Amino acid sequence: MQLSKLAFTSTETTGFDGIVRKFTDIYMAVFKMEKNLTKEEIIEYYVNNPCMGGNIYGVQQASHYYFGKDVKDLNLVEAAQIAGMFQSPNGYNPYINPNDANERKNTVLYLMKRHGYITDTQYQAGIKVAIKDLLKGGTTSVNEYQGFIDTVVQEIIDNTGNNPYDVPMDIYTTMVKSKQDIINKFYKSYNFKNFKDKGKELEVGIGVINNKTGAIIAVGAGRNKTGAMTLNVATFSGQVKRMPGSTAKPILDYGPAFEYANLSTYGPFIDDKTPYGGGNMRNFSGGYSGFMTMRDCLRKSINTCALQAFRLTTNEQKKEFAAKLGVEFSEETLPDSYAIGAFNGVSPVQLASAYSAFGNNGKRSTPHSYTKIIYRETEEEVKPVIVTEQVMKPQTAYLIANVLTSATSSSVHVSGTSIATKTGTTSYDTTQLRKFGLTSSVIPDSWTSSFTSDYAMAIWLGYTDGLTKETVKKKHYLLNGTATSERIKIQAWLGNKIYEKNAKFKHPGGISSAKVELETIPAQSPSDFTPSKLQGTFLFIGNTGPSETSQRFAKLTDPQDLSYNINNKSLTLSWTSPGTPSAIDTDYLTNWFKSNWKIQTDKYLKKRISYNKKNIGEFGFAIYLTQGTSSTYVGWTKDTSYTIDMNNYSGLYDGAIIKSMYSIFKSNASSGRKVVFTIGEADITANDVTINVSNQNVTLSVGGTYNELNKSSISSINYKGNDIKGDVSSLSVTNSSITDGSGENVAPSKVTEKAGTYKAIYSVSFTYKGVNIAKNVTQTITVE
């Protein structure tokens, strides 16, 4: 009946199915097997069918695998070892669990003595022999694909309750050999030279998911794998999973905020003291940066901003969003610590599956390592249940991908492919660190989770045995700086080989791009004069972008009610002020910061006032005297009147312009208001000016074409040694007369009809500093 149980029926032991299985065992044993097989054949079938550890089946294979000999050549101790493995072949595998295997061997020897099969002398001699000393070579050869096999086996057990090592079946896996071979090569060849003992005990768990199907295409189940069904660091199956650190931020913080709160890549957030757990949230850097955009918050992994984003959505919204990504919580209320990934936990495969939705326009499929199994005895085909669903809006997925693309190291590069990356680091409790005399630079986990539009890959770096006296003594722990540097190298090593070329994230529509003036809350468009360093372009869901233009640097309002008074050489100008602009008005700013900044209001109000004093200055007015279209700057004042001593200015002026203007930041000065008057005396006459033309003497042929002078013919206008051509206005050139050698007038069109010398006189007129000037220039024309 034991044989029928192992070979032909299910493993169910409880309930109605258990009763059915028991009667089936009896039926198979009594009516089928014992009628058709001899007892010797039954025993032979029994010992040559079961799994004996890993991929070893039957006692003959086991004899060669463990002891390098045929089963008929085994000694008493070796035979006792194999006999004891039937109950738990992997648990009593001497390569994997030598101590448990030795105890099991001793139990078998004791039972053999008790039932009279061996003597006490044989028993005493047998228990003194350590089974590890009898093993072939003392080590095991592990199938290079064992990690993926283990992943598949565990999933089948979880899904069906049947162990492929016990129940014969054909399994169709999702493994892509070329991708798995890359990870296998990484395990064999990567040099962990920056770690103690070259990282001998260091583990790297890896999970790679096909975004569109959910298929697990490759895993890194462990660098130090010693056999089948040992610790799998790709899935942490049956183990406590690891804290994800900041890789949780897209899942619990920013993803839900995009989905439910219409967060944009602008945000914004205030990186400063944020109440948390009876104190304040701390950043890894130990400092704060103040105003930050959402893009920078996630890209730089700022904890305070993550906590603020976490609080933008309800508890139910966060739990629902995470659950759809395969990260479920039993807690009714998620504590604030989860905002920075301080929870147990996730595995690389689980994290890669969650991130696959970000690369697939918000769609996620159930992660799976096999597509179907066929039971050999019944030929029954069973497929895993795979659900594909839209777990978030396509816009949410795209925004996360867009932001995280800018967080990818330049060393990770695949031609034509956009790669998005989020890293994560966890920390030990300070009490635990103090216990072993360690600093906060010692960390338990270092993560990299990245994705393209095709694949998602999560990498975990760490030690599996935690902090103990032994591990601390051997320095088997991560140092944050080393781990951070190494994870970038590992991501590049793997990503540059696993990711395919020309994979771009698909823009889903429903997203608008808009320029924003930084430090505006809510987002406002920059004005024409906003400094470029205070501008940025960001993405918004739908039409939630800026609807107003910021007035902080907007063009100032002109003064009103201009008047003047002339007293001899004294000119007094007066006007009405439009009022202090809100951008530098302390009362306005106080109310604005209280209403919008929320965090550390007084601190950032003072910072803004200080910025204004250094970069904008005081509000006042600039005064200019005008001469036609040209103007001369006179001075600046905070007052609403200004007196000019005209003895200091030469020339004739036709008015003045008053502009609202800051004392330092002048770009956004108002257009200005003009008051008209006449003051001063002209200090320029035609006699003071010399006009030069480029073709003052010209030679033409009879029958040729004569071109009259025009404005472009004027090469320079000299006044007091300076060329003032660029400063004049209303420049014009007109023909006065053309005469031949006898003094007769000649029309311009007749000049080249016969040979001779001609004199052309042109009148050049212009306005300079309010004075109108007219002067003749002469051109000599020779016709041959």
Tell me what each language-model feature is.
Residues 1-118, 224-227, 301, 311-312:
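Peptidoglycan glycan-strand catalytic modules in the bacterial/periplasmic cell-wall system
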Residues 1-13, 139-141, 263-318, 335, ...:
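Conserved catalytic neighborhood of penicillin-recognizing serine enzymes
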Residues 42, 112, 183, 214, ...:
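Active-site SXXK
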Residues 57-60, 120-122, 258-277, 315-320, ...:
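Short, well-structured active-site flanking segments
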Residues 119-173, 179-202:
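Non-catalytic structural connector segments
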Residues 173-196, 208, 219-221, 227-240, ...:
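A penicillin-recognizing enzyme superfamily signal
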Residues 423-710:
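Soluble, non-transmembrane domains of envelope/secretory-pathway proteins that act on or interact
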Residues 722-768, 773-779:
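Serine/threonine-rich, repeat-prone extracellular segments and beta-strand-based repeat modules
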